[in-house]
């Protein structure tokens, strides 16, 4: 399992419109609780620090540093409270105008920097109607 530590309920995820309003101690207590509940299962492969927080140019302006801060906090918590290393990453929306920059920023690492993504997920949605060619949906571009 790769578990998203966030939920759609108010206060339980990064607010993409104003991330500074949601990244607080209550939020961290909640996400650390998710780690506590799943860290002991051998089939826990990783944790998503955030999922589709950036979905356009406007949300890509302020959110990246908050996502990396959550990744750092999760990794530090896991290092102190788990008997094993559990990877932490980001799950991105398939928004082509920001996708490459998002990937580059999330995976960029420096010495002693624990905020980079261990993995990068991509949510690519396709409406599959078998009577219509996949090229109509541009899905063939994702496969390249």
Question: What would you call each of these model-derived segments?
Answer:
Residues 32-62, 89-91:
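Active-site groove signature of glycoside hydrolases
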Residues 1-5, 45-49, 88-90, 118-122:
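Hydrophobic faces of well-ordered beta-strands that scaffold small-molecule active sites
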Residues 9-18, 43, 55-57, 96-99, ...:
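Eukaryotic short linear interaction motifs
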Residues 7-36:
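Active-site-adjacent "subsite" loops/lids of carbohydrate-active enzymes
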Residues 29-36, 42, 68-72, 76:
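Solvent-exposed, polar/charged alpha-helical surfaces in well-ordered, non-transmembrane soluble domains
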Residues 1-2, 33-43, 106-115:
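Acidic (Asp/Glu)-rich catalytic clusters
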Residues 19-26, 39, 59-66:
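Extracytoplasmic/periplasmic, Sec-exported soluble proteins
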Residues 59-144:
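Noncatalytic carbohydrate-binding groove/subsite architecture in carbohydrate-active enzymes
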